[in-house]
């Protein structure tokens, strides 16, 4: 069985990493970021649900002893 020649693997891996780094740098350089970020006021919508206006009784779990 012939031996696998791995002498070119290192240059292939290094060139691939450099190429990926350059591509990511080019991709990230296309974004424009604001010079001074400002807070954006967001209004949270209020949802009314039927159970919010009703009174509900909270019961103790059955495992706890009764308090008198």
UniProtKB/Swiss-Prot annotation:
The modification N6-acetyllysine is found at residues 54, 57. GO terms for cellular component: mitochondrial membrane; proton-transporting ATP synthase complex. It comes from the Eukaryota. The modification N6-succinyllysine is found at residue 54. Keywords: Acetylation, ATP synthesis, CF(0), Hydrogen ion transport, Ion transport, Membrane, Mitochondrion, Transmembrane, Transmembrane helix, Transport. Its main location: mitochondrion. GO terms for biological process: proton motive force-driven ATP synthesis. The keyword Transferase does not apply. It is a single-pass membrane protein. One of its GO terms (molecular function) is proton transmembrane transporter activity. It is found in: Mitochondrion membrane. InterPro entries: ATP8_mammal (IPR039017), ATP8_metazoa (IPR001421). The chain crosses the membrane at residues 8-24. PANTHER family: ATP SYNTHASE PROTEIN 8. Belongs to the ATPase protein 8 family. Subunit 8, of the mitochondrial membrane ATP synthase complex (F(1)F(0) ATP synthase or Complex V) that produces ATP from ADP in the presence of a proton gradient across the membrane which is generated by electron transport complexes of the respiratory chain. ATP synthase complex consist of a soluble F(1) head domain - the catalytic core - and a membrane F(1) domain - the membrane proton channel. These two domains are linked by a central stalk rotating inside the F(1) region and a stationary peripheral stalk. Component of the ATP synthase complex composed at least of ATP5F1A/subunit alpha, ATP5F1B/subunit beta, ATP5MC1/subunit c (homooctomer), MT-ATP6/subunit a, MT-ATP8/subunit 8, ATP5ME/subunit e, ATP5MF/subunit f, ATP5MG/subunit g, ATP5MK/subunit k, ATP5MJ/subunit j, ATP5F1C/subunit gamma, ATP5F1D/subunit delta, ATP5F1E/subunit epsilon, ATP5PF/subunit F6, ATP5PB/subunit b, ATP5PD/subunit d, ATP5PO/subunit OSCP. This is ATP synthase F(0) complex subunit 8. It comes from Ceratotherium simum (White rhinoceros).
């Amino acid at each position: 069985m012939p031996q696998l020649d791995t002498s070119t693997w290192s240059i292939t891996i290094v060139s691939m990493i450099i190429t990926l780094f350059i591509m990511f740098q080019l991709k990230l350089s296309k974004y424009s970021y604001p010079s001074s970020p400002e807070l954006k006021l967001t209004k949270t919508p209020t949802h009314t649900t039927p159970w919010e206006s009703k009174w509900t009784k909270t019961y103790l779990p059955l495992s706890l002893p009764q308090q008198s």
